[in-house]
Amino acid sequence: NILQLSNSESTLEINTLLLGCSTKSNNTDTVGQFGEGYKIAALVLNRLRKTFSVYNNSKDEIWISKFERSEVFNEKVLMFEIIPNHTNNDGLVIEIENVTLDEYNSLYDVWIGMPDAENHKAIETSYGRIFTEKDMRGEIFVNGLAVEKEKNLYFGYDFKPQYITVERDRKSCSTWDMRSTTSKMICE
């Protein structure tokens, strides 16, 4: 019941623990730039009694999120304990414990990059992929992450992040960007 999300190319700097700090701010190849993502995820998952740990291998550290009582605020606050962890591994692994099978299976609905996910027929373009199967009509993804469903679209789309502005909650995107980019994709 452990879910691991890994990226052999990634590393996190300590300042990204601060809300609003991000390593993605100027990276058009990634989704997210607000510096809130993994911190909010850690907060929500801890509230759901899941463990959320970051194996920041390139820094030889493990960051373990947990609630602790703050003497300053007299409240439980989310904090990260940083533990030295000398390893020969590279990259970043985010580990979430206490994941049920139903929770794991629900990830197939929101991320098309899941292991053993259905391989949908698609046309590759420089802007992303156009899904041609009927069951993918109106499905909108950015970099594989489900963003929204647009009933007026004949095809489904997986946009490269540099062409679409995703809203802070990642549940919607700029309609103008989407319409402009879909027309460019179809013209290709």
Please give the residue ranges for each predicted region.
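GHKL (Bergerat-fold) ATPase N-terminal catalytic module, capturing the glycine-rich phosphate-binding loop
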Residues: N1-E103
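GHKL/Histidine-kinase-like ATPase module
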Residues: K76-I82, I96-E188
